[in-house]
Amino acid sequence: MGTRFGHYTDLVPKGFVSIGDKPMILRSIEVLLSCGITRIVIGTGYRCEVYEELKKDYPMIETCFSPLYAETNSMYTLYNTREVLGDDDFLLLESDLIFEPKAIRSLLDCAFSDVMLITPVTKFQDQYYVEYDSEHTLTNCSVDKDDVDVKGELVGIHKLSHAFYDKMCRDYEVILSEQPKLGYEYELLRMSRSVSPVYVLNVPGLKWYEIDDESDLLYAEQYILPYCQ
């Protein structure tokens, strides 16, 4: 719900916070369209009606409301979209990002079907740190650097096949009641460790930033936005 943004999210979801003169979600949509994406599904919760308004200008957008958004987390939101997504392979994006088109193109060009995008550790934010083996298979991730052999940090953009997502949802159903607040990152890790490998694509030099609060917003406007226009 973007509580760290204070008044910025009193009336709109976090993705509608503007960087420069445009909301983050609109920037993401424009990048996706420029890369040839023709269908966009948005999992909604807080202030869902704001996302509904988007569909008037972007007819390729579909929404899927999660009535449990306040008591669950990102994995439940993803799980909740399963009927809307249907049999499609898809890209999974978080709403609080700014990124250059290279992020999307790198995933689309990657030969692997189930892919986590990361970059080398360069920022000073709180991040999900990622570890992978010699085959680039995801082996660990954590917000604590000391827990992993850090190879990079999670961007928050992924490519998933329908076959993988279907297995992911079935695996999550088993633990849903015990872990309603599970983030999708940790379900990806569960899958990669025991069900189906997730390939980690490490892209040096990629310009992106996760925007969680006002200080992130100021940093991104000064140092990242010029590369993402």
Which residues are covered by each model-predicted region?
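Conserved N-terminal catalytic core of the sugar/cofactor nucleotidyltransferase
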Residues: 22-90, 178
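Short catalytic helix/loop segments, enriched in acidic residues and glycine
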Residues: 11-27
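A structural signal for short hydrophobic beta-strand segments in well-ordered beta-sheet cores
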Residues: 16, 130-132, 200
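Conserved beta-strand segments of alpha/beta enzyme cores
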Residues: 15, 60-62, 137, 197-199
